[in-house]
Amino acid sequence: MERIMFRAKIHRATVTQADLDYVGSVTIDQDLLDAADILVNEKVDIWNITNGNRLHTYALSGPRGSGVIGINGAAAHLMRPGDMVIIAAFGNFTEEEARVLEPKVVLVDARNRLLELEPA
């Protein structure tokens, strides 16, 4: 049996842009994607700390060092620039893998610059 487990998150990031006319997804600074081990086009959950909205989408790469967290498409109705969010990724793991899994937690400052990486 496989279990769906939390494996990584970018914690308390700040939304920098919301583009209603974009096709969809969330644009994330590539440095943050790398730190969290989230791939381009990977499914992510976004939990809005500011207003409580939650959604599923997929990750796109933004310029390195830009701090961009861009909410695209219809999701821009639910999240606005300045909102604080958690971006989380999950994966399927065997029982053995799940028991030793150490999720990555990427902490950022108010400008979405990497502060530290710590296990969950």
From Swiss-Prot:
The modification Pyruvic acid (Ser) is found at S25. Keywords: Autocatalytic cleavage, Cytoplasm, Decarboxylase, Lyase, Pantothenate biosynthesis, Pyruvate, Schiff base, Zymogen. The keyword Lyase applies. Is synthesized initially as an inactive proenzyme, which is activated by self-cleavage at a specific serine bond to produce a beta-subunit with a hydroxyl group at its C-terminus and an alpha-subunit with a pyruvoyl group at its N-terminus. The active site is at S25 (schiff-base intermediate with substrate), Y58 (proton donor). It catalyses: L-aspartate + H(+) = beta-alanine + CO2. Heterooctamer of four alpha and four beta subunits. This is Aspartate 1-decarboxylase. It comes from Deinococcus deserti (strain DSM 17065 / CIP 109153 / LMG 22923 / VCD115).
